[in-house]
């Protein structure tokens, strides 16, 4: 409803209420006082017989008579009984008899005037209830209704052409849309329409965008709702809303129902703490029944999205409810290149902006990250009063997205600046001289976020996609993390070592313990996984992880972790000691320029015959 229509509706309602109030006031407070005197029937007959009355006006139904007042005042009113001798008495005494004609208009007017106020009150109450039912402030009569947004002719302004970098997921949903448009081509071969598609992937990979594209392409009614909109504070509301949603969907079949963040209502049953669990389970049970229960729902396709498939109930995940599970993962290099092309539309880019280079520098970025990256670059260009976005703004935006904005107003003393420079130079130098490790992308001692300085590495595309990390890579990772702490020890002495490496030490301890207890990379303990990994209690898992090893094994684990950390420490220290001159030069450049990129670092290493780290 438009704002003008809503305005006129409210004005009409207020006018109706004003009329009701005025009518009640006029009926109860402005009623005229009764000034006509009455005369009893006996006195009336006596006066007629005494020849004191010469004229009488009878009503049409002969129930009342009006008698002239001798004093000249208003006539007397006489209520007449059913007396058949009355006319004879009047004629015997020569009384002039006049009968008032019967008026139909007066009869209907009396009926209308009698019913006017009750009808007006009923109409006013009806409109008040209608407004309370549809208004945003009071939902007392609408709790059981579904809150799904319905688009009979989808106008999301998003098509599959706007979705890039996730071709496999797009193919799966394109087939679903094709099934809705050309069902005969599939049914002739005996194929059945899939009942549900579950989109699974990390946040920001484009799951909701895919659903919008389906709405834009399908040409069928599209219902969209969030999983959190089912359950309210009242018992039974969630199940009622599920029923209402599917009743609307069945009435508009074929159609698509999109449930975003389905993990809010589809979590595992029978686990967790708290009193709200039963209501959520009741809602989930109703959802399971509607999706594939005793009654079918032919023509309704459920598309759901979640980034927590591990907490979903197994009954919800089975074929027949969600026939397809589409993984929407982080895009690879080619996917990032396509996504950057899509988000670069409408932005004025300089000639030096290389989208290929940006795509290579951003492994692990999702579609939302890349969109935010170009938007931050555009904001920086506008802040600097530029007419186009250059590569400098893009580079600054990458740093801003990864580590937060620069803290240019923070003044660093020369001593602290030198300390941070050596710390970051230690990380970078060890990383650059470790065999088969991620290349250094950038070194900076400009404070960002909670960090005093940062060293960026470009992760390997293959390692990120496969999730497979070798033993040598993990050992190199620990050595690189220890490089900053060791550089402080070499330059300033063990007594001047700071707490700046606390996060690095936590990372080293975590990697070493995982190598021993999860990955079986301990020579002493062998290829075994120790310690049963359990999830949180609210995710439907055990309250605590079980310890499935003895105290002696725990002591051996601690010894192995300490040995791995010590080996990484010795390797990193050897690299920095053998390349002490390069370490000093790199720190001096950082103090002077505050930022060193990968090209400058490679030039420095090549000109000084850097010595690589020894293999383990």
Swiss-Prot record:
It is a multi-pass membrane protein. The active site is at residue 424. Induction: By UV-B light and oxidative stress provided by methyl viologen. Disruption phenotype: A homozygous disruption strain was not identified, suggesting this gene may be essential. It is found in: Cellular thylakoid membrane. ATP binds at residues 201-208. One of its GO terms (molecular function) is zinc ion binding. The keyword Nucleotide-binding applies. The keyword Transmembrane applies. GO terms for cellular component: plasma membrane-derived thylakoid membrane. Homohexamer (Potential). Part of a large complex that includes FtsH2 and PSII. Coimmunoprecipitates with YidC. Acts as a processive, ATP-dependent zinc metallopeptidase for both cytoplasmic and membrane proteins. Plays a role in the quality control of integral membrane proteins. HAMAP family: FtsH. PANTHER family: ATP-DEPENDENT ZINC METALLOPROTEASE FTSH 1, CHLOROPLASTIC-RELATED, METALLOPROTEASE M41 FTSH. This is ATP-dependent zinc metalloprotease FtsH 3.
């Amino acid at each position: 409803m438009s704002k003008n229509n809503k305005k006129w509706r409210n004005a009409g309602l207020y006018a109706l209420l004003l009329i009701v109030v005025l009518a009640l006031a006029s009926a109860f407070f402005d009623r005229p006082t009764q000034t006509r005197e009455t005369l009893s029937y006996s006195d009336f007959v006596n006066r007629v017989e005494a020849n004191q009355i010469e004229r009488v006006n009878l009503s049409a139904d002969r129930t009342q008579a009006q008698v002239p007042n001798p004093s000249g005042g208003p006539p007397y009113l006489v209520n007449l009984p059913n007396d058949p001798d009355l006319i004879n008495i009047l004629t015997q005494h020569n009384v002039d008899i006049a009968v008032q004609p019967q008026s139909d208009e007066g009869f209907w007017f009396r009926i209308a005037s009698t019913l006017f106020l009750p009808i007006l009150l009923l109409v006013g109450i009806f409109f008040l209830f209608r407004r309370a039912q549809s208004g945003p402030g009071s939902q007392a009569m609408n709790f059981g209704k579904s809150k799904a947004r319905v688009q009979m002719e989808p106008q999301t302004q998003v098509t599959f052409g706007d979705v890039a970098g996730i071709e496999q997921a797009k193919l799966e949903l394109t087939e679903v849309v094709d099934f809705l448009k050309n069902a005969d081509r599939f049914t002739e071969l005996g194929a059945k329409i899939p009942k549900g598609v579950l989109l699974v992937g990390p946040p920001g990979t484009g799951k909701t965008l895919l659903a919008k594209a389906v709405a834009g392409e399908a040409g069928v009614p599209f219902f969209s709702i969030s999983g959190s909109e089912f359950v309210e504070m009242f018992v039974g509301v969630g199940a009622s809303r599920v029923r209402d949603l599917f009743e609307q969907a069945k009435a508009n079949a074929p159609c698509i129902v999109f449930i975003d963040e389905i993990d809010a209502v589809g979590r595992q049953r029978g686990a967790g703490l708290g009193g709200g669990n039963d209501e959520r389970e009741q809602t989930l049970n109703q959802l399971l029944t509607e999706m594939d229960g005793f009654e079918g729902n032919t023509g309704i396709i459920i598309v759901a999205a979640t980034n927590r498939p591990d907490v979903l109930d197994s009954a919800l995940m089975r074929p027949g409810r969600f026939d397809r599970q589409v993984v929407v993962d982080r895009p690879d290099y080619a996917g990032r290149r396509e996504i950057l092309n899509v988000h670069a539309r409408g932005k004025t880019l300089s000639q030096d902006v290389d989208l290929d280079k940006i795509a290579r520098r951003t492994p692990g970025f999702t579609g939302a990250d890349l969109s935010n990256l170009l938007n931050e670059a555009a904001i920086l260009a506008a802040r600097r009063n530029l007419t186009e976005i250059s590569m400098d703004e893009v580079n600054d935006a990458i740093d801003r997205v990864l580590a937060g904005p620069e803290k240019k107003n923070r003044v660093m003393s020369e001593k602290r600046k030198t300390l941070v420079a050596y710390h970051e130079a230690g990380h970078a130098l060890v990383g650059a001289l470790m065999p088969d490790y991620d290349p250094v992308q950038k070194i900076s001692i400009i404070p960002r976020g909670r960090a005093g300085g940062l060293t960026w590495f470009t992760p390997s595309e293959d390692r990120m996609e496969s999730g497979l990390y070798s033993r040598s890579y993990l050992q190199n990772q620990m050595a690189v993390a220890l490089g900053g702490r060791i550089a402080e020890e070499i330059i300033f002495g063990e007594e001047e070592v700071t707490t700046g490496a606390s996060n690095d030490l936590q990372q080293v301890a975590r990697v070493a313990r995982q190598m021993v207890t999860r990955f079986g990379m301990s020579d002493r303990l062998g290829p075994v996984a120790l310690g049963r990994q359990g999830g949180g209690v609210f995710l439907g898992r055990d309250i605590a992880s079980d310890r499935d090893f003895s105290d002696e094994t725990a002591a051996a684990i601690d010894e192995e972790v300490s040995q791995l950390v010590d080996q990484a420490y010795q390797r990193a220290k050897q690299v920095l000691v053998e390349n002490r001159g390069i370490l000093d030069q790199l720190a001096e450049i950082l103090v002077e320029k505050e930022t060193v990129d990968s090209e400058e670092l490679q030039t420095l290493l090549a000109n000084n015959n850097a010595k690589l780290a020894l293999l383990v």
